[in-house]
């Protein structure tokens, strides 16, 4: 682990390669798993504000889940996560005619309809954040369904922290990211 400002960054974030390969996985991280995506109170409030833009594109099942239980629920560990359909699909996920999964929030953002890209936990994936005392742990979450992303990342020699530059800056700021890059460069120079 490396200490960068108020974070403890896992060595895997610097050493492991990763690059989403949507041609292979088709975005299955949005529709697999046993819980929704981690969500902050602020993000839930923002999604509540933009929900009228999203509702028309949500599936009938997703709208029913949101109506019945709301935008989020507490997972077994007590963490607030996005609501899911049929115990796996995020309520904001849709599948196109080619079987590709996409995020309705991100689609609306890219179309200029809203000013919120998506929850930071989704944007940062495969990094997960967790509280470690008064620090934030920044850790790599290894999931079997992302095997193709590890293969492509290795082929491209693209470490996780470089692949996730934009969301890391979004969450922690440019100064933090620059410091992370310095730590990574020093680590490489030492032949680690």
What are these regions (language model features)?
Residues 1-192:
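Short loop/turn segments that flank or connect secondary-structure elements
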């Amino acid at each position: 682990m490396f200490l960068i400002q108020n974070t403890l960054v896992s060595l895997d974030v610097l050493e492991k390669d990763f690059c989403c390969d949507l041609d292979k996985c088709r975005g299955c991280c949005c529709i697999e798993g046993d819980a929704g995506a981690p969500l902050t109170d602020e993000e839930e409030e923002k999604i509540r504000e933009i929900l009228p833009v999203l509702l028309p594109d949500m599936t009938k099942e997703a709208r029913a889940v949101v109506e019945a239980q709301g935008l989020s629920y507490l997972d077994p560990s007590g963490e607030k996560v996005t609501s899911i359909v049929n115990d796996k699909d995020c309520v904001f996920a849709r599948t196109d005619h080619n079987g590709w999964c996409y995020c309705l929030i991100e689609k609306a953002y890219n179309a200029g309809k809203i000013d919120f890209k998506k929850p930071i936990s989704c944007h940062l994936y495969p990094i997960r954040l967790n509280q470690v005392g008064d620090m934030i742990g920044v850790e790599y979450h290894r999931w079997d369904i992302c095997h193709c992303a590890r293969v492509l990342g290795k082929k491209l020699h693209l470490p996780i922290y470089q692949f996730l530059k934009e969301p890391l800056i979004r969450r922690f700021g440019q100064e933090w990211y620059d410091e992370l890059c310095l730590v990574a460069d020093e680590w490489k120079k030492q032949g680690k």
